[in-house]
Amino acid sequence: RRSSDLDELTGALIGLAQAVGEDKAEPETDRLMMEGLFATLTNVNFDDDSLKKQIEAVHQETAKYVPGCMSCQEPCGRTADYSMEKLWQDQEDIRSLKSLLLFGMRGTAAYAYHAMVLGYTNDQVNAFFYKGMAAIGQDREMEDLLPLVMEEGTVNFKCMELLDKANTETYGIPAPAKVEMKVEKGPFIVISGHDLRDLKLLLEQTEGKGINIYTHGEMLPAHAYPELRKYAHLKGNFGTAWQNQQKEFAGLPAPILFTTNCIMPPKDSYRDRVF
């Protein structure tokens, strides 16, 4: 079920990219493209209703760029949702290159989204999402796709620079820090993933309320940033790697805040404590 929803969302994003074409997209379109690609990463979203809402939002955004397509009596299909089944059934080399391009852009979109919520964007990075997604929906030869895959690598490197700039200018230069691995007595919240802004907001909202905060998994590096480490109630780190969460969270007497691509399908033993 989830796989079909993710394919449907990806196909809708390809249709949006075709509709935008070589025009400069609006900021809201960029956000939808980033969020959509991000949502299709592994371990991000297991909520069918949420994915359906994203698909509908993409359709509405596509209609803004090509309003005539919605009422066309002889649709060409160029801006319609792309059927991902066509990609999965394509010739092996074409399928491999398009998949590599798609999976790379999904990762880049995650970086770009985290930078965007801190107020940092890059026009070259954003523009490539449309270029790359449109190419996936078109009939392309290996000679066309391989340079695009290489370009995605370059764009991803630029996006990593952008995210590093966003994080360090917002939270300070990271420095080695000692992190406590034991949980103290008293109320606490565990936060997982790697959205530093979510952690910052959580620290601000719980400051002075007697609630301790513990990172988990990919959030561990947050302790290195001065503007986050300065909060006395950021006490330490809980647990081990993300793939052990279903076992480790089962008996955890605290809410767990998931922020990015770190969540596994929650078990009933702790589902009601997941946010």
Q: Which role fits each region the language model picked out?
A:
Residues 188-193, 198-208, 213, 242:
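Core alpha-helical transmembrane segments of integral membrane proteins
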Residues 215-233:
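Short connector loops at secondary-structure junctions
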Residues 199-201, 223-225, 265-269:
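Short helix/loop capping segments that flank catalytic or ligand/cofactor-binding pockets
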Residues 171, 191, 213-217, 257-260:
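General beta-strand structural signal in soluble alpha/beta enzymes
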Residues 98, 108, 218, 238-241:
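Long, charge-dense tracts
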